[in-house]
């Protein structure tokens, strides 16, 4: 079996820096023959995770993309790490469309999108470190 494809990035807190992470996902996914539409969903989840890390974290954002070329069931794992104050992911309310449409604050869809687009999502957070680990299998969802 082939070795995993691993890419590590440190993103600056700069406009459009999250797009560097999407390029890494694209390259890694192509190497394990992920379908284009599946890669688009993974990239959207990664953008959301990176934007959250940049908005709520402190300093640089660390991203690791690993494409596992398992012959029968290849999968992509992405971890996004920030060093902000941390948060309780279980305390983030699930957005309700009708409420968001009436609210002046339309944001707050990021975690819900990530959870819907990926097969597995694990969030660990404490003061100084938040890690969002996401997995998507080819043929998943």
Residue positions per predicted region:
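Short, well-structured hydrophobic secondary-structure segments
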Residues: 45-46, 50, 54-56
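Conserved short strand/loop->alpha-helix "switch" segment adjacent to the catalytic nucleotide/phosphoryl-transfer site
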Residues: 19, 23-47, 69, 103-106
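Conserved beta-strand-loop-beta-strand hairpin that lines the nucleotide-binding pocket
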Residues: 1-8, 54-141
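STAS-typified acidic loop motif
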Residues: 8-20
């Amino acid at each position: 079996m082939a070795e995993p494809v691993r890419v590590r990035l440190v993103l600056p807190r700069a406009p459009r820096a999250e797009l560097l992470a999407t390029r890494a996902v694209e390259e890694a996914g192509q190497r394990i023959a992920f379908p284009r539409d599946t890669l688009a969903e993974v990239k959207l989840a990664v953008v959301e995770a990176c934007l959250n890390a940049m908005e709520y974290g402190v300093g640089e954002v660390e991203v690791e993309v690993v494409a596992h070329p398992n012959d029968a069931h290849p999968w992509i794992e992405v971890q996004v790490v920030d060093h902000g104050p941390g948060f309780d992911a279980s305390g983030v309310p699930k957005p309700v469309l009708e409420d968001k449409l009436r609210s002046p604050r339309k944001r707050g869809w990021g975690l819900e999108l990530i959870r819907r687009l990926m097969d597995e999502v694990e969030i660990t957070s404490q003061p100084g470190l938040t890690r969002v680990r996401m997995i998507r299998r080819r043929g998943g969802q």
